[in-house]
A protein has these predicted regions:
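Residue-level detection of beta-strand scaffold positions
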Residues: 21-22, 33-34, 84
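Surface-exposed, charged secondary-structure patches
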Residues: 52-103, 112-116
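Short, low-complexity N-terminal intrinsically disordered segments enriched in polar/charged residues
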Residues: 1-28
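Catalytic subdomain that performs nucleotidyl-dependent activation
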Residues: 106
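Short, well-ordered alpha-helical segments enriched in acidic and aromatic residues
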Residues: 27-41
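A solvent-exposed, acidic/Ser-Thr-rich amphipathic alpha-helical stretch
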Residues: 40-58
């Protein structure tokens, strides 16, 4: 069964620990941990200096709470976007997390990740 053919529940079960690792690593400003599940395409664009600048200038991405909830999946081509409701330990309100997953070499990898 291809990755994109899995049910939403199956994909969310795979996505939750990946998202959790992104949160933990981002809060610790840990480049190696943050990029460990990146696809080769994402790694190519994930410059450690640029990520460091983002961590320094954006309070939200280093204060993410482990209180998150996946609420849906969108399929497009070879990728699935998992949407998360995310909160922060310092910023008020709820934020939208977006995690784009796909298969690379038989493993589920990150092809995109953002928070709004």
């Amino acid at each position: 069964m291809s990755f994109t053919s899995k049910t939403d529940d199956e994909i969310i079960k795979l996505a939750n620990p990946i998202w959790s690792n992104l949160i933990r690593s981002s809060n610790m400003k840990d480049y190696g941990g943050f990029t460990k599940d990146f696809s080769s395409q994402m790694l190519y664009g994930a410059n450690e200096v640029e990520l460091g600048k983002q961590w320094a200038s954006n309070k939200l991405i280093s204060s993410l709470s482990d209180n998150f909830q996946a609420f849906g999946c969108l399929r497009r081509g070879m990728h699935v976007t998992v949407l998360f409701k995310q909160t922060s330990t310092t910023e008020e309100g709820e934020f939208l997390g977006r995690l784009v997953l796909g298969d690379e070499g038989g493993s589920v990898k990150i092809f995109g990740a953002t928070i709004f």
